[in-house]
């Protein structure tokens, strides 16, 4: 029985992780979990599974829940997340949090000797250098949940690092893949959230529409698989059937195919190196797909993808600033405070304005994150004046 600590249980990845756990009740249990403000979802979860520890965002929610569920230990806030991460009574941390808030729980779990199943992109985008050092120091493993990185992870099995020529990360192109730059000026939040292939959370769906998400995945792949940025390519693939590929030095290309269902990479992260049965609503049928298409990405059409390569290669505080500015700008667009293309302007301006600084400590990351957020807030005020 593998005991999980699930952070971000009420989100898209979190709820699908619970679905995987419920499909294999003899293999997995959940020792503890966290949710944000979705107390309604938490109560539904607690009807399905037994947990001993729960973290919520607000102290008032913690107190109310503690009275309703006396057999559960409740915590709240960032400190509560770190408390869960540090606990000894679990085997694998599943980090499904969204944003920079996911970094410190990952780091603390590693320092406590826990293996990580990672869906939180920002852990590696913002703090990849520190996480890389910690993983080596504490001898733990990191298993990717992102479908693209899971595909690469699977395609690498049985081969050696020196045999890899390049990684090919596929990209659907998001909600606006067929729109021109001119057409993007007036797109709505509702249009941006209508992803053609995947059912995801709101933030990542917007990040997919402007390809910031794919840029994050390039940086993640660099740290996950120790591959230089010049050997990581993005390939447009609108069908989302091939989730990513690995080209080897003999020019063989290994690809992982599957239905666009996140439960598949979630389960593989939980069960590696084994494979368990999985009930999917619609498994992949290649005869229905019939045709697959591929193209090179237009970096002028998707400038945030180019920016991610730039920030990743330079390193230091630039990825943290990029992420922070994007978190703020993405949220502002979803709140209808800025137009869609303003997200790009704000994030690009942040990275090109900040003074480069090396990142040696957690405080360096916190400072970079704060700078990026403050800059983005100022830019948003300028857009609205």
Indicate residue ranges for each PLM-predicted region.
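Catalytic, metal-anchored helix/loop core of enzyme active sites in primary metabolism
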Residues: 1-385
């Amino acid at each position: 029985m593998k005991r999980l600590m699930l952070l971000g249980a009420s989100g898209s990845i979190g709820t699908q992780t619970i679905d995987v756990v419920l499909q294999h009740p003899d293999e997995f249990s959940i020792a503890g979990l966290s949710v944000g403000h979705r107390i309604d979802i938490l109560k539904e979860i607690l009807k399905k599974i037994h947990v001993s520890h729960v973290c919520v965002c607000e102290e008032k929610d913690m107190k109310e829940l503690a009275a309703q569920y006396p057999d559960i230990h409740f915590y709240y806030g960032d400190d509560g997340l770190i408390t869960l991460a540090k606990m000894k009574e679990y085997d694998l941390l599943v980090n499904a949090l969204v944003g920079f808030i996911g970094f410190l729980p990952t780091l603390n779990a590693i320092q406590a000797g826990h293996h990580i199943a990672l869906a939180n992109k920002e852990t590696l985008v913002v703090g990849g250098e520190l996480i890389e050092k910690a993983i080596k120091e504490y001898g733990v493993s990191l298993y990717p949940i992102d479908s693209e990185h899971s595909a690469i992870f699977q395609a690498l099995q049985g081969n050696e690092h020196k045999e890899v020529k390049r990684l090919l990360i596929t990209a659907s192109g998001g909600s606006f893949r067929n729109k021109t730059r001119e057409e993007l000026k007036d797109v709505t939040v509702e249009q941006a959230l209508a992803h053609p292939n995947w059912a995801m959370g709101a933030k990542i769906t917007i990040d997919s529409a402007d390809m910031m998400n794919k840029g994050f995945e390039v940086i993640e792949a660099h740290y996950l698989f120790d591959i230089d940025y010049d050997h990581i390519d993005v390939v447009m693939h609108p069908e989302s059937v091939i989730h990513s590929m690995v080209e080897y030095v003999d020019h063989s290309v290994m690809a992982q195919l599957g239905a666009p269902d996140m439960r598949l990479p979630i389960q593989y992260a939980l069960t590696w190196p084994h494979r368990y049965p999985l009930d999917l609503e619609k498994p992949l049928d290649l005869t229905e797909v019939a045709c697959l298409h591929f193209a090179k990405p237009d970096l002028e059409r998707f400038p945030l993808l180019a920016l991610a390569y730039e920030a990743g290669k330079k390193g230091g505080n630039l990825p943290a600033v990029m992420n922070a500015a994007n978190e703020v700008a993405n949220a502002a667009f979803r709140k209808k405070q800025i137009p869609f293309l303003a997200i790009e302007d704000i994030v690009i301006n942040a990275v090109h304005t900040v003074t480069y600084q090396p990142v040696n400590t957690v405080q360096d990351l916190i400072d970079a994150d704060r700078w990026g957020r403050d800059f983005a807030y100022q830019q948003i005020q300028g857009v609205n004046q």
